[in-house]
Amino acid sequence: MTDIILKKADPEDVPAIVAVERKMAGSGTCYAITAEEEWKKEMGNSVVYVIIKDGKIIGDAAFEVKSKDHIYGSGLMIDPEYQNQGIGREVLTRFVKELKGVKRIDMTVHPHNSAAIGLYLRFGFVIESWKDNYYGDGQPRIIMAKCQ
């Protein structure tokens, strides 16, 4: 799968990112940021990429640099219409390759998001812990990590 483009997000991308996040918000398996102002703040704290297919933003991927050896993958969101097509796998492949020198990559995932958990496990992530109310939304999260 090479027909997707990863582009560093800019403020003009925020409405399209929010549209995808709003589609995902009702799933109950993710923490979606559905306000444009929250996304602009997130872009100041994280490195955010948009996922583009056929000229359309279909998702986003974000990470925070904790240190030169530690990255926190703060989000990987794919529009439900484009899920189960290998796009998440392609994005994760590119990021893991790009972050080759990083010793530790952390991710959080909702326990009901079995597709994401399976994907991360296939990439060598391990389940480290369970956190109740992780984002303050009343929902638990699983913390997964990959040490390279």
What are these regions (language model features)?
Residues 8-14, 18-81, 92-94, 98:
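Acetyl-CoA-dependent GNAT
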